[in-house]
Amino acid sequence: MKIIIIGGVAGGATTAARIRRSDETAEIILLEKGKYISYANCGLPYYIGDVIEEREKLFVQTPEAFGVRFRVDVRTENEVIFIDRKKKTVTVRLKSEDTYEESYDKLLISTGASPVRPPLPGIDSTGIFTLRNVADTDRIKAYVNNRPPRRAVVIGAGFIGLEMAENLHALGAQVSIVEMGNQVMAPIDFSMAALVHQHLMEKGVNLYLEQAVASFEQAGKEVKVVFKNGQSILADIVILSIGVRPETTLARAAELTIGEAGGIAVNDYLQTSDESIYAIGDAIEFRHPITGKPWLNYLAGPANRQGRIVADNLLGAQIPYEGAIGTSIAKVFDMTVASTGLPGKRLKQAGIVYASSTTHPASHAGYYPDAMPMSIKITFDPQTGKLYGGQIVGYDGVDKRIDELSLVIKHEGTIYDLMKVEQAYAPPFSSAKDPVAIAGYVAENIILGRVKPVYWRDLRDIELKDVFLLDVRTPDEFALGSLPGAVNIPLDEIRDRIAELPS
């Protein structure tokens, strides 16, 4: 069997390796339009910021080494420009602009996603970059080495945007983040993003939220970023991190079905509308395990998982892909931000009734040195307790807790399962009541009606003069600021001062 794979990063390379491990006779051709395959895409911002000092460490495998190890015909700088489904051939363009045709028995599309670059006036000004691949990285790296930036503007506050903000800050730049929405990091709810906002400002990052860019202007060696409200800021370098969209050019030209979310439509076996053509990675859409609606998921973990599954299916298996729930994590200066499943805002958009709990445990036993605070928000079905999503913002131990929440959600578990998870415990690592268990306990109290939560958004609709607002923080904490009309009775004094509470 002759299998052609279009795209050699993440899913494409994984697929090729898996096919070879399963079948020594298959002819495998890997076509990649860039110079590199199998590189650490997620590590690119850290190379720019000198956290990763050696460029070579970004490459998991060179094309030559990969080809030898797995006996794969790796062809870099070979861009597929057309798929002829009737002839079962692809047309490939070389760096020289010459073209050739290659036939296939089975074809895999792993073309990834392309950065959004809106047609704004001045967007081609010197000093404006996107970051998606090694070539982009090399351009940015050369630019900042040649002209160390004093002021940097990052447009877009997703994962890459915040990682670039941190790394440009590490290079000594005064960083400003411009975001059209009212918060950074869209996968989490506003209440959790507010913690990230505070941390960014503590680090000296300027936040311009709910600001849309109208244009760019060259101002000598600087770039002027002009907002739609007329305000403007200057920068030595601008990073566009507005988002990405599925790279479906080839699929559209081949008249493969494109789904309602804009990705290549695939069935449960990652097969497109052509039975000989499969697709994986950022280019595809699939049904969300919770909502059942098509969605796009731009994460390396699911792409590699899809690569393993599709390799077997290309060889004749029928292994279904279970979908992905978007488990993600990012380092934002000293803070770790993670999410899995669906936040409240997306559940609301999907018309799914939910409840939520927010808890603020420590990363490990408080009496052991260096215990750090974390905030955990979970969303769940208010009747059955089925877990829908989790978000964690903290400094230590965030990664293992988000993975526990992800595992429960993937197995369609409930908040009661959070209470039953048996975590390893020792004071340096956790508490006897682990933060995940505490989140489950509080959610159970909400479901059973033992507590009735009032969420921060509810305060906008409450006449505070008509309620007794009790603030149980310490006097020093209360002095830092409180809601109008709040009465301060520290938690440890409530029993002795119970008479002061209204009946």
Kindly label every feature range from the protein language model.
Residues 5-6, 80, 102-112, 155, ...:
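Short hydrophobic core segments
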Residues 118-120, 458-503:
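Positively charged, proline/Ser/Thr-rich regional signature most characteristic
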Residues 124-148, 224-226, 232-309, 404, ...:
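FAD-site-proximal beta/loop scaffold in flavoenzymes
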